[in-house]
Amino acid sequence: LVRKVLNLPWKPAVILLFSVFANDWNLQDRLSPVGKLYDLPMVSVLDAVSPQFALKNDEGRVISKNQFFYDMFHPSNAGHSVMADCIEYLFERIDQAGHASLDAFEKGLTEEKILQENLNLAPVIGNSFENIRLLDKKDIYAKAYIDEGGFDSTDTQLQSVEMDDQLSLTPEFPYNWMYDGTKNTLNREKAYFELEMECRALLLVFKDSGEVNVGKAKVYVDGEYHFTADPHINNWQHCNAVIIFNNKTSENHVVRIEIAEEDRDKQFTILGFGYVL
């Protein structure tokens, strides 16, 4: 994702913000090498707040865990304010620092050229999905052959988020394919979705849900069973991306998503696909 953003033509600024879980852990040790390779500013909320959680008020504690966290993984409003303060502190430090890095001075290159050189180096984690594209009802790939079978409805009960500076909620993946066996009994006779295309990697994005009227779907590639997509494993409404295959070369494949026989009277939503040619 970082490489994808850094390669965008409008050259957006990138900051890596490492939040923290209630067990005083995050992924900064695993992911910070990405920031170091591309010389990106990084903010660690863990480093900012976790050391003071164990202190008493008269020892310098600023905020308690109960005040900072809304649940195990998400900050409260007060916690988000602390995170905003951390980012603001980063901007203050940047304003105080010189604009040219030592590397840029020693190499005689602009920071933009150094970044481009680093992007040409081997990635520290991977870049298998750097050029991934979305496939849904709106963003259709001309060489993808789709038989939607019984997936002829559109799900409107979707995970929604605030986008950019908008406070109103925007549904994610609105151009989806939904199988609805609760209303249309004819769908139960064609409880499948088929996609044929040539690509190197393919991801399925489906909707997780805790509703009782949601069922499972089995995923087949070229007639071979691969896995079952079960919305109840996570059991709350959100988007779940899973890898169907990730190969070294691009080949033609037929992917069939078939509603489990015992769940033909329920619903299942394909939010979209991600593909790499």
Which residue ranges define each predicted feature?
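Glycan-recognition and processing domains
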Residues: 96-199, 203-210
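Extended, polar beta-sheet/loop recognition surfaces of beta-rich domains
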Residues: 264-277
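Alpha-helical cap/lid subdomain in secreted, periplasmic
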Residues: 1-104, 170, 177-203, 207-254, ...
